[in-house]
């Protein structure tokens, strides 16, 4: 799925790694975008587990076991509240899925989405948008959460 990204992952991965910010990446495939559903790929599942947000391995299949978690779309000039649904459908082997309410208004198929967290919310960044790159300046990123403050921010 990440191989379909319209934006190279290496540069943005380095940005977050240099700041010690845990990040996961998702790329909505054309089919997933149409259905507003994405596979919760292994690195995303690990990200959720490592941050104490969700453990898909312990989740049972079906709508009764869906978990909803607060989330936000990060825009260059504001943050828009949304939610993430983490679930395993009854079909097939219950492959883990994620659904972000309103995703279609925030991205296009094959856009690179970066997910960061302050452990209270998931923050979704459309890294395929040039305006989001500008908004990732450290002093702006720290407005999402103090966790994202780094030495560059403190120096300003």
Enumerate the language-model features and the residues they cover:
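Intrinsically disordered, charged low-complexity linkers and terminal tails
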Residues: 1-156
């Amino acid at each position: 799925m990440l191989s379909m990204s319209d934006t190279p992952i290496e540069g943005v991965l380095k940005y977050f790694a240099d700041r010690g910010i845990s990040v996961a990446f998702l790329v909505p495939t054309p089919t997933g975008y149409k259905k507003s559903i994405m596979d919760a790929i292994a690195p995303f599942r690990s990200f959720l587990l490592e941050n104490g947000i969700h453990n898909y391995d312990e989740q049972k299949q079906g709508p009764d076991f869906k978990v909803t978690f607060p989330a936000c779309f990060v825009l260059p000039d504001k943050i828009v509240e949304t939610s993430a649904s983490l679930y395993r459908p009854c079909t097939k082997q219950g492959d883990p899925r994620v659904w972000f309410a309103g995703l279609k208004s925030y991205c296009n198929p094959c856009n690179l989405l970066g997910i960061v967290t302050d452990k209270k919310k998931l923050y979704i960044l459309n890294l395929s948008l040039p305006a989001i790159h500008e908004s990732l300046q450290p002093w702006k990123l720290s407005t999402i959460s103090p966790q994202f403050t780094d030495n560059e921010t403190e120096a300003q």
